[in-house]
Amino acid sequence: SFPTRRSSDLTKATIKGLILDLLQDPHYIGSQIEPIKLILANTFHLYLRPGSKIVQAAGGLHQFENWKDGLILTDSGGFQVFSLGLANQKFNDQKHTHKVGIKLTEEGVKFRSPYDGSKHIFTPENVVDTQCELGSDIMMVLDVCSPAGSDKKTIEKHIAMTHRRAKRAFEHFKPKYEEARGVLFPIVQGGSYLDLRTQSAEYLSQFAWDGIAIGGVSVGESRELIEQVKIGRAHV
């Protein structure tokens, strides 16, 4: 176990301009600050560049970025694809021609690389495989993140899909569980609706073998709503 922080440091599998040892050195970060034991690496960007198999061939993320004594959490990449959808809407509103081609289906989420326009699909299964290749300690399932301001009916639809994806992800991960370096977390959704978050947490508890994550926060809603969700999270 380890103490969690309000935020985790996000990397692209590298720390620039800083010796990694300093992140855990109290003389550098200050004696009042808990040494950093967990960093987050971005699955979406690592999948596209340099590619999870290249990271795997280099010995996994811990060897790749020389983070040998700490833990690494990887996200599913779903939020980044969600963000691409918002970017697509923004560009369309400004009458630009930039297209990122986001399409949410039962199979997964289809998108185009923002780097070269190539087509890709994230599924509950291949996202687990990608994170296993990266050598993550804490992995996340592919969920559906509802945009801020979504009505309750839309969020309920997204929660149902999130739950189906979690079931698929854990069925796929179960045979790998003993050999995998890391553990897999389901992600609770529900927007700002405490009743929906409670329902989501109750359903996903069957998959909380090692932990559970809270998703769909800080996606454009007001600070007041974020605080409400934080208070509700403690209740859930």
Show the residue positions of the predicted features.
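Intervening/peripheral non-core polypeptide segments
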Residues: S31, I231-V236
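Non-catalytic, usually N-terminal nucleic-acid engagement modules in DNA/RNA processing proteins
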Residues: R5-Y177
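Short, small-residue-biased leader/transition segments that mark boundaries at the very start
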Residues: S1-S7, H235
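Glycine-rich phosphate/ribose-binding loops and adjacent secondary-structure elements
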Residues: H172, K176-R233
